[in-house]
């Protein structure tokens, strides 16, 4: 008689859901107050003028205007500002 033994289980086959991080509004784009500009882990980008920081380091617009990316300071940090 043809028999097949039970197959062993695999230990792989899992993956976490993607977190959809990254820049949501790019330089020169118009934003409204409250719009999310960047979702990030840690402060890859720092908040500049008219930009707020959320509990999870999300950067968001505090006023209406255009997004501006700039590199400043001795450590070449990336700042995001809103030009009204």
Swiss-Prot record:
Chain intervals for the UniProt region annotation (Disordered): 1-22
Entry keywords, A to Z: Ribonucleoprotein, Ribosomal protein
Cellular component terms per the entry's GO annotation: cytosolic large ribosomal subunit
Keyword Ribosomal protein: yes
Record carries keyword Cell cycle: no
Pfam families: Ribosomal_L27
SUPFAM superfamilies: Ribosomal L27 protein-like
Domain of life of the source: Bacteria
Stored Gene3D superfamilies: 2.40.50.100
GO molecular function, one term: structural constituent of ribosome
Coiled-coil residue spans: none
GO biological process entries: translation
Family membership noted in the UniProt record: Belongs to the bacterial ribosomal protein bL27 family.
Protein name in UniProt: Large ribosomal subunit protein bL27
């Amino acid at each position: 008689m043809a028999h097949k033994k039970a197959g062993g289980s695999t230990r792989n086959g899992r993956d976490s859901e993607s977190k959809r991080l990254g820049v949501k509004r790019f330089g020169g784009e118009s934003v409204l107050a409250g719009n999310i500009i960047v979702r990030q882990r840690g402060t890859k980008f720092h908040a500049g003028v008219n930009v707020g920081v959320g509990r999870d380091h999300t950067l968001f617009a505090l006023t209406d205007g255009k997004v501006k990316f700039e590199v400043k300071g001795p450590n070449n940090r990336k700042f995001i500002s809103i030009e009204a």
